[in-house]
Amino acid sequence: MTDKKDTIFQNPGPAEDFEFNSRVVEVFDDMLDRSVPFYKEVIQASAQLLQRHLKENDSVYDLGSSTGTTLLELSRVLKRQDISYVGIDASKPMLEKARLKAELYSKGDQFSFLEEDITQFCHQEAGAVILHYTLQFIRPMQREEVMRRIYASLRPGGVLLLSEKTISHQKELNRDFISIYHHFKKDRGYSELEIAQKREALENVLIPFSQNENKNLLKKVGFECVESYFQWFNFSSFMAIKPQP
């Protein structure tokens, strides 16, 4: 399957709030590859952690599963026929592309993609929940409730893998991180106009927490073991384990 190049913000004009519509879906995989530092490496690291924590016949849920890339790559690395993979997203175009990709890779029997509001997540006895670069799009006042739902959904010993764009409350350092990320995107072919217009479109949509704010949120809802497992400047990944009784 050939993915189209992300050219959404190439033309000057007033930027509308970013949304996961059909236009974004067409270029989403390219957008991720060029906009999220070490995206593939984070999935690889996630797979290594899951390999050590998943039990027989566990289910893995990906909230905000988009085009299914994360789950498909996890299944390729894990090579576990007993694991069920469930992608949840509110975007019909995203789900349609995810289902098509799963069929193309002959993964249809092991995968399901559900159209649901992840803020109402209520599945039970999950072995793992993945939340990569998704929580940042949920309104801050709703995040604690979402985390409580995820915590309740996990079996004892189940894991949450969370990746987020983060903010530093040290203003000078935060400016440095933003500048480095700006150059990262330029190196991957985005123009100054594209970078500026996307930043404006995301301004009131993507609201990052700091590393400590994310960790404290996880601990507040009941997770006892919370650790960072990947960081690139203002992008961070966390693992949280639900305690055994």
UniProtKB/Swiss-Prot annotation:
Signal peptide annotation: none
Main function: Catalyzes the conversion of S-adenosyl-L-methionine (SAM) to carboxy-S-adenosyl-L-methionine (Cx-SAM).
Any matching Pfam family: Methyltransf_25
Keywords: S-adenosyl-L-methionine, Transferase
Source superkingdom: Bacteria
One MF annotation (Gene Ontology) recorded for this entry: S-adenosyl-L-methionine binding
Subunit record text: Homodimer.
Species of provenance: Desulfotalea psychrophila (strain LSv54 / DSM 12343)
E.C. designation(s): 2.1.3.-
Class of the enzyme per the UniProt entry, highest EC level: transferase
Residues reported to bind S-adenosyl-L-methionine: 39, 64-66, 117-118, 199
Family named by the database record: Belongs to the class I-like SAM-binding methyltransferase superfamily. Cx-SAM synthase family.
CDD domains assigned: AdoMet_MTases
Protein name as annotated: Carboxy-S-adenosyl-L-methionine synthase
Disulphide bonds in the chain: none
InterPro entries assigned to the protein according to its UniProt record, in alphabetical order: CmoA, Methyltransf_25, SAM-dependent_MTases_sf
Catalytic activity: prephenate + S-adenosyl-L-methionine = carboxy-S-adenosyl-L-methionine + 3-phenylpyruvate + H2O
GO BP field: tRNA wobble uridine modification
